[in-house]
Amino acid sequence: SLLNPNLNANMKSVIVIGSGFAGLSSATFLAKSGYDVTVLEKNDSLGGRARVWESEGFKFDMGPSWYWMPDVFERYFKSFGYEVSELYELVRLDPSYRVVFGPNEHEDQSANMAELEAMFDRLDPGSSKRLRKFLAEAAYKYEVGIKDLVHKPSRSLLEFADLRIIKGLFQLDLLKNMRKHVAEVSTHPKLKAIMEFPVLFLGALPQNTPALYSLMNYADMSLGTWYPKGGMHKIIEAMVKVAKEQGVKFRTETEVKGFQYSGKKIVGVLTKTGGFSADIVVAGADYYHIDQEVSDKDRREYSKQYWD
């Protein structure tokens, strides 16, 4: 976790590849810890997938369209002395979204829990009671999974030697998969599709995903779907503001094409316009892109077949 980067600030210079959420977050926390940070972005504007495209007076989000888990953003901005409300205005969407099953066949996901439960009971009488139990368990998983596990640096198992965490592991459903867990609420095909849907954000299949990730259903159904007025780029604008206040420097239209090495250590990056040396290089771009297109062939972690 870069919330408490336990790094040696004597290693002063840092290059961050990419100005998406991950790159900006890394850059701001490292700069706050005393590093000299430069972000390199290949596009002509900042934001990575969350950049904005403007044409004929219209603005279009180029990537994310939903704002989930608002507490994560609140935690980030509070680390730099800001409330989210000082930087952009959030609106909770109702319905959260529409699930389309076919021509003239859809279900709206209400932001109102009573209406959501009524929809479950309409499709599968009695299922709302099981949904409440499911979400109560998911809320616990969210509390432990996000607040006690995700925000730890994961450098040592000793970080997790906490009685609350150890006790909590037995309630996280690590040995059950999401498909079976969802079936405990309902086997109705539409409800199963609605409840399994958030797992897709993990790039996984429900049958291969631990039931721990029902915490995503809690994020969806209980915490809600939000949208920043003015578009997703408002978040990027806020993060760039914070980054610049911390002293982060930005270079757009600077695509990283390769790494500079000294033995096994990366000591810089190569671009079309020249090289940039750094004590630390943080890759905020896609894993595939870094592994297959930026790293030298003999230094790639995975084969092309693995990615295919």
Kindly give the residue locations of the regions a language model identified.
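N-terminal amphipathic/basic-hydrophobic helices that include classical n-h-c signal peptides
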Residues: 1-10
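N-terminal glycine-rich phosphate/pyrophosphate-binding loop and immediately adjacent elements
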Residues: 12-143
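Conserved acidic residues
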Residues: 13, 267, 279
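Rossmann-like flavin
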Residues: 102-210
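Short beta-strand to alpha-helix junction loop
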Residues: 169-178, 221-241
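Glycine-rich loop(s) and the adjacent beta-strand/alpha-helix scaffold that form part
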Residues: 225, 229-238, 245, 259, ...
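A conserved short coil-to-beta-strand element within the FAD-binding core of flavoproteins
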Residues: 252-266
